[in-house]
Amino acid sequence: MILLQVFLPEITSGQNEKCNIINFASAPGESLSYIVSYNVFIFWTDVGVVNFTVSEAEKDKLKRLYLHGTGLSFPIWNWFFKVKDSYESWTDPVTLKPYEFKRDVYEGGYKIDIHYIFDRGRNIVCSTSSKTNKPEWKDTIKITECTYDVLSILYYTRNIDYSAYNPGDTIPVTILLDNELTNIYFRYLGKENIRVHGFGKFRCIKFSVYLVEGTLFEGGEDMEIWVTDDDNRIPLKINSPILVGSVKARIISMKGIKHRLNSRISKK
């Protein structure tokens, strides 16, 4: 039920690579919304909604791309496990490298706040963190040139040149996760046509994410993601088993997309 973790999971080690992407897939004005559903045995239940927006912002007199992701549990479930998550990232508009990141999470009565300031000139991050029943603490973390946060990495994956890979190839990157530098990878699985309720049939690029076993997810490459096979690379569907049951997310709204939706085969 930790909604944004469906999109921004804990991921495990791989090898690093040069982060030579150019952002062509997203632009200010884009807004994407998803329903997150949970399954135990044979029953699926909608438990919350996740939203992602892109806008322009100015930080330190420089133009930035402001990425914002939110996750909210539906009120009917708040008595059981209330979720109110917010992730913010201020990135370079072209490379998507982050310069500032904020995570404000409330899940089942437990609160986490994390704030990163990226010093790209010195390749360090100044971190300020706090958790429920734990006082605020600060840290300085050495990073690589190609380090991303858990929100900007989602947009990074939309700009990978998948035509340069064969099915089964892995694509490594580096993220800063809970104040630790972690190498991660995605596995390109090829192309597949899928239907999405309310939107029709699409040609998609499919890949998996290698997950760390933890409080929510099982370890392994069982999380699968389908994105549109066009210049928007919009995530349409995500499936993943968790420790008890499984979760899935499907798109319910897309607005302000940068390119024509050329991957749509039909509207039915």
Residue spans for each PLM region:
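Alpha-helical structural elements
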Residues: 2, 29, 33, 72, ...
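Active-site/ligand-binding surface loops and adjacent short beta/alpha elements
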Residues: 120-177
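Acidic, serine/threonine-rich low-complexity disordered tracts
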Residues: 15-120, 162-268
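Bacterial N-terminal signal peptides
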Residues: 1-9
